[in-house]
Each structure stands twice: as structure tokens, then as C-alpha cells.
Amino acid sequence: MFINNNLFYFFIILTFLGIKSDISKSKTKKKPNVLILFSDQHNKKTMGFENHPDVITPNLDKLSNESVVFDRAYATRGICVPSRMSLMTGLYPRTMGLMDNNEETSVTDRATSLASVFKYNGYKTYAFGKRHLKGGGDKGWDIKKEVHPEEGDNGNYLSWIIAHGYEAEFSYDWAAEFGKGPKGSKEANAKIPTANLGTRISKLPFGYSMEAYTALETIKMIDQQKNSDKPFFCFSSFYRPHQPYNPVKKFMDMYNVSEWGKGTKLNSAIKMPASFYQPTKDLPPLLQFQRNGGNKVWNMDKAFKDEQLWRNFIGAYYALVTEIDHYVGDILQALDKANIKEETIIIYTSDHGDFAGNHGMVEKAAAGHNVYEDILNIPLMIRIPGKTVQGKHTAELVTLADIIPTLIETLNLKTPKLENNFEGVSLANLVLKDKPLNRDYIVSESWFQSTVISKSAKLGIMKQNLVNSSQDYREFGDMFFDRINDPLEINNGINDQKNQQTIAQLRVFYEEFIKQVPGIGITEIVNKK
């Protein structure tokens, strides 16, 4: 009996230890990794799954089938830095005082970045490729490698390409827009010919572009992290399809630009964008200026006399999107090979779009009017292994400022002390439980134009430019687009009587927005003037 009692207690102890071990394991279970795949200036419609007649993106198509896809995701401002900072800080440009690329305020200096939040929660943090961030938005990285040399970085593309013997080739590519080599290169002060519409075929061989470098560093990180007991947050940020438009030959050869055709997917030449011939007089002032050759970098007036230049640019843009897709595929394959794809949340998005020939325009027309869908509507897909409904599309209105609160709620992250509370909203219930967000509107704004976007309409409000009086376009008037009946945004219906009730409601929405987001950063910038 004594022996039996001892055995009984022995088994009780073993069972207790087993339970305790399981509890301990559950407490220390590693959180999911987070990988943001980011591109610069990616027009949302230029992907295969968007039924584009030309653009080839098999890897993004596959990712979309595994993700929740946001059809109505928008940039908070249609240029790089303000939009990227909204992603990284959860703040709107007016709060940061960051309406252009070069502004800095006490808000940007003290902002808490997404990387800092992850680091605070025990993540290893990485950034590869173009960051283009300010102040606190660029803090919190354990390892960071940019395109150009940056103080405090762990490496950069320029040093890498020089080490491989292709400095002159990269400088030639860079000069297509800037007329000289990149800062830090031997050709930084050289005079190298620019290219019409910033477009020419790269002299670099396949595998040596900025995109290749970003992918290579990301894949190396994945291999290093696969057995780590620490989760990772990685911001893999491709420079392209931003100008200069220099695809390598491998991808350019996929598009026939010799004439206008029915589309690459019909084994024809590229198809002319539907709004390509929109009359100049119907465009807002800054775009009229560009169209008439006001910016000699783009030579749009020359291009309309020789449409081959337009086809070269549009084909090059498509080729750059396909190149990004190729490297996205390599990164996703590396996750599979490391057997950690199902442990990794994957987000694909961009900071803003590119006209890509629509409205007869190139790039974002040098930070032109902050209103068109081509510039503001961005790709966004979120894949959470085992939780997201695969291939689901949602038409809910969202912005990049929503990403940081979404990840915090989804992963139950703790936040360090915040100087300013996040202004975006969490999409967790929408992504994980398919609960509607029921947002009536969102706002994207520059110094001279604020755009209110509802589910069916858009109002671009011209306003007093508080920092640059030469860019004050109130005389031109506001712009209204019926997104249901005019998806190409060709007809400005601001004076149409049938639109007045909708326009009035959009103005009410904007007044509501500026009360909720008063613009402490804007006030700081204006007071400095």
C-alpha cells in the first residue's frame, strides 16, 4: 500500500510538472513575426489581380488570394515622407506639420515609431531599402540598411553596388532624372544626360538593382532569424516603381511598347490608358503647368509630340512593378524555405501612386494636386496566418495611419509612453472578424488641397497655402468627382446642381475632421514662417 501511495504521488507530481511546463511554454510562446513589404509610388490598379490589361504580377496575385485586400486604402498625403510617417507613427500629416517631404517639427521629433513599439515588445527590428522617414519615425531599428549612405546605418545599396563594380552603371540610371550620379558616388557632381520622362533602360545586369539589394538583405535576415527565439519586425522597402524609370532589360522585354495595342495579356502591345487624352484645360493648375512643359525633367510637351516617349515610360513603369513582384516572390519563397511563413504576418502596401499615363501625366506630376485616385488610392493587403479570410476584398475606407493600431491590437502589444495618441483606427475586427468599420469618410491633404473621400464621391478643396503663396489655387476652384459614375475622374462636377447636396455633406465631413485633428504641427510650421 505504501508503494502504491508513493507511485500515486509520483504520478501526481509528474502531471503537475507537465501542466506547469505547458503553462510556461504558453506564456513564453513567441509572437508572430511581422514583415511589411513596401513599394514606392505603386498605382493600385497596376497589378494582375486588378484586371489590368498589361501588368504581370503573379506573386502579388498569389499573395492577394491569401490575404484580406483593401480596395479603398488611401495615402494620407500623395507624396513620400508624410505618407510613410503616417504608416510609422499612426499620425496624420496635419498633426505632424508634415505636408511636404522636408518639414520637421517637435511632433515628428518626439513621435513613437512602429519599430520602437515592436522593439519595446522584444522584437528584433530591421529596415532594408528606402526608409525616407523623419525624427522619431525613423527610430527603433536594430539593423537598418538604406539605398544611400545614412549616418548610423549598418550598410547601404550604394556601397554594395560600388563593391560589385557597377557604380558607373547605377549613376547612369540615377541621372535619368537628376542629371548626375547619386550623392556619395564618383559621379555625384558629374553632368550626365537626363532622359525624357525620366525613362531609359538600366545598364545594370539583372540582380543588381536597388530592388535586388532590398530582397537580398531581407532573405539573409530571414535565414538568420528562422531559429531565433525572438520574433522579428522587418520593413522591406523597395525604391521602385518610383522614378527614375530604369527597369533592367529582363523585365522591360516583357512589354511591347512599339505601338498602342490591346494589352500584354492579349499578346499585344501595351494598351493606352483610358484617360490619356484628357484635355489640358480640364486639369488643375499644377498639372496644366506640367503638361505644357513647365518641368523640363519630364518634358511632357515633347512627349505629346512623340507618343513613343509615353509608351517607353508606361512600359518601363509596368516593368518596374513586375520587377518588384519578382523580388516579393523571392522573399515569400525564403519564408517558405525557412518554414516560418505561417508564423509571419505579411503586409504589402505603398506610400502613394503614380499617374502611369492616366490623365496624360507622369509620376505624381512633381507633387501635384492631392486629389486623383491614381495617386491617393494605394495597394494594401494583410495576411495573418490561420486568421484572415483568404482572398477577401473589402471596400471599407482605410489609411496608412490605421496600420500601427491594427498591429498593436492584433498582437496585443504594449506601447511605450506616447507624446501623441495614435490617430488611425484599428482594423483588427475588420480583418479578423469581418466586422464592418462603418467609416463615412477619410481625408488626405496637402498645403493647398484637402481631399475628402467618401464611399461614393470625392471633394478636393482648394485652400489658402499657409507656407507658399505661389501655390494657391483657390481661383481655379474646388474639384468634385462622382466615383460611381465617373471612376476615371475626368468630369469635375463641382458646379453640377445634382451634386450640391453631396458636396455640402463632404464639406461637413471636412469641418468635422479638422476639429478632431486640429493640426498642432501645422501651427508650429506656420509660426516659424
Q: Where in the sequence are the language-model features?
A:
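Catalytic-site neighborhoods of secreted/periplasmic enzymes
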Residues: 89-205
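Short, structured active-site-proximal loop/turn typified by the sulfatase FGly-forming signature C/S-X-P-X-R
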Residues: 51-84, 90-91, 95-96, 119-126, ...
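Active-site-proximal N-terminal segment of extracellular/periplasmic enzymes that hydrolyze or transfer
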Residues: 27-68, 119, 249, 491-499
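A short beta-strand-to-alpha-helix junction
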Residues: 30, 53-57, 74-79, 104-112, ...
